[in-house]
Swiss-Prot record:
Signal peptide: none
Listed GO CC annotations: Golgi apparatus; Golgi membrane; membrane; perinuclear region of cytoplasm
GO molecular function: ATP hydrolysis activity; CTPase activity; GDP phosphatase activity; GTPase activity; ribonucleoside triphosphate phosphatase activity; UDP phosphatase activity
KW Hydrolase (keyword) present: yes
Pfam families per the UniProt record, alphabetical: GDA1_CD39 (PF01150)
Source species: Caenorhabditis elegans
Localization (cell): Golgi apparatus membrane
EC number of this enzyme: 3.6.1.15
Swiss-Prot/TrEMBL keywords: Golgi apparatus, Hydrolase, Membrane, Transmembrane, Transmembrane helix
Protein name stated in the entry: Nucleoside-triphosphatase ntp-1
Length: 543
């Protein structure tokens, strides 16, 4: 085979005959590549945006819910039961209670008294914490037996996770400030070295009467199941001790314009913004209106008036008030009128509000006759002594009291010897008439509860459980534990978000890598294509 060469001269400016001239269709194809590239980039950008949206939506919705369900499944297992220890440091002694706590995310804590061998884990030591006012260095040793008792009933591995609460009440309130501070400081500084329980300074303190009332209100309604979402009805409570009387009830009417104080907004839910467990409570303590302080008021009135006839004592009971001798007459109706006159402070101006407690104290415009009220302590002891404990009937109760007060004191003493009064000692029998008049007057004249149309009852136990404000305190403060659980939930959600963002960026990098690879591949193809079109034959042939 022979090669045929064609050689001719040509100007440098003359187009070579072997140079390929682009046709119009080829020109269009040459400039179509950038447009295709833009389309590819647009497509990739759209895909990226869709990926971003599909990544963010689960973070704010379904994924978050899945995380919450996952955490709840851990939180609400039987193996996640926590423990709580609380000491009720009263005036006569300190009682320790151990509770089991099962947190439920978003709602109330399921709380129960710890039971061991069919008995509640409860222990009391005497005397009261306030008796250490002049020897505060001994308070740690005083409480140590209680703490050892609690530690014996809590799994060892959970001792460090179990909070210890020590709340002191009336006895400690009466001490001088220096003695109060010394006792509290010794407990805060000394307990951490003698117990494995978790001790926090903020959980060792003196609580005021209003909060004692709130804790009682919480305990009563919790035991009765009144915090269930479908149950809107809450009960109120009146707790009369020896020195004071406490009252607490819900102000459910949002239109209530009362601004006289003693109103507290509490939230028992694990999230402050959760309105399901948020309540507005009126709670206060009236010092001087306990049964023993009331007796002092009555006795002082007899001495001041020079009246030696004691209508509030059984007939024939003669006694000394200081150096003044009074003689029991057992006149119940006279007694009731005299005691009623002691309610309120006559030195204070009359109450300008339509509703007032104890005749002088401005109160919310809530008709307590329509509120289901539970009476504790002295209300139970006094009414039950006359066979009227439980559902309260004014006429039946006063009839029984009247019969008792008219008895001769010698006959009452003989009945005591025959065990006719199993729930009272001899001193109590002498004051029964007065205390019946006092609790009645405070209820009807002090708190305006109607004598016939009302929902009041005296109780010692609710659903077989003795009411203790300590239960309410533990329930209220258990939300601190729930906040810790929420932190776990937030960490899980944060971890999920980080995972989602990481996944998004991985996808984005892959998309960009594919785009870059396609661009490089397209450029290479384009250059090769142009080369082939402009150089149809090897250079050495163009000679």
């Amino acid at each position: 085979m022979r090669w045929r060469y064609t050689i001719r001269d040509q100007s440098p400016f003359e187009e070579s005959s072997n140079c390929h001239r682009l046709t119009s269709s080829e020109t269009a194809n040459t400039f179509r590549w950038p447009m295709r590239t833009y389309n590819v980039y647009g497509f990739l950008l759209t895909c990226t945006c869709l990926l971003l949206i599909l990544t963010i939506i689960p973070m704010s919705g379904g994924s978050s819910e899945r995380v919450q369900r996952s955490v709840r499944s851990v939180v609400e297992t039987k193996n996640n039961i926590k423990y709580g220890v609380i000491c009720d440091a009263g005036s006569s002694g300190t009682r320790l209670f151990v509770y089991t706590l099962k947190p439920l995310s978003g709602g109330l804590t399921n709380i129960d008294t710890l039971i061991h061998e069919s008995e509640p884990v409860v222990k009391k030591v005497t005397p009261g914490l306030s008796s250490f006012g002049d020897k505060p260095e001994q308070v740690v040793e005083y409480l140590t037996p209680l703490l050892r008792f609690a530690e014996e009933h809590i799994p060892y591995e959970q001792l460090g996770e179990t909070d210890l609460l020590i709340f002191a009440t009336a006895g400690m309130r009466l001490l001088p400030e220096a003695q109060k501070d010394a006792i509290i400081k010794n407990l805060q500084n000394g307990l951490k070295s003698v117990t494995a329980l978790r001790v926090s300074d903020s959980n060792i303190r003196i609580i005021d009467g209003a909060w004692e009332g709130i804790y009682s209100w919480i305990a009563v309604n919790y035991i009765l199941g009144r915090f269930d979402k479908e149950n809107d009805s809450k009960v109120g409570m009146i707790d009369m001790g020896g020195a004071s009387v406490q009252i607490a009830f819900e102000i459910a009417n949002e239109k209530e314009s009362y601004n006289g104080g003693n109103v507290y907004e509490i939230n028992l839910g694990s999230i402050e913004t959760n309105e399901d467990y948020k309540y507005k409570i009126y709670s206060t303590t009236f010092l001087g209106y306990g049964a023993n302080e009331g007796l002092k008021k009555y006795e002082n009135s007899l001495v001041k008036s020079g009246n030696s006839n004691d209508s509030c004592s059984p007939r024939g009971l003669n006694r000394l008030i200081g150096e003044f001798t009074v003689n029991g007459t057992g006149e119940w109706d006279v007694c009731l009128a005299q005691v009623s006159s002691l309610i309120g402070d006559k030195a204070q101006p009359s109450c300008p509000n339509p509703t007032c407690f104890l005749r002088n104290v401005i109160a919310p415009s809530v008709n307590l006759s329509t509120v289901q009220l539970y009476g504790f302590s002295e209300y139970w002891y006094t009414t039950s002594n006359f066979g009227s404990g439980g559902e309260y009937h004014y006429q039946k109760f006063t009839d029984e009291v009247r019969k008792y007060c008219q008895k001769d004191w010698n006959d009452i003493q003989d009945g005591f010897k025959r065990n006719e009064f199993p729930n009272a000692d001899i001193e109590r029998l002498g004051t029964n008439c007065f205390k019946a008049a006092w609790v009645t007057s405070v209820l009807h004249d002090g708190f305006n509860v109607d004598k016939t149309k009302h929902l009041f009852q005296s109780v010692l136990k609710i659903a077989g459980e003795e009411m203790q404000w300590a239960l309410g305190a533990m329930l209220y403060h258990s939300k601190d534990l729930k906040f810790n659980l929420l932190e776990q939930l937030e960490v899980a959600q944060s971890t999920q978000q980080i995972s989602n963002f990481f996944s998004f960026f991985v996808i984005l990098i892959i998309v960009l890598a594919v785009a870059l690879y396609r661009q490089l591949q397209s450029e290479s193809t384009y250059k090769k294509y142009n080369f082939l079109r402009t150089d149809s034959k090897p250079d050495f042939l163009n000679v």
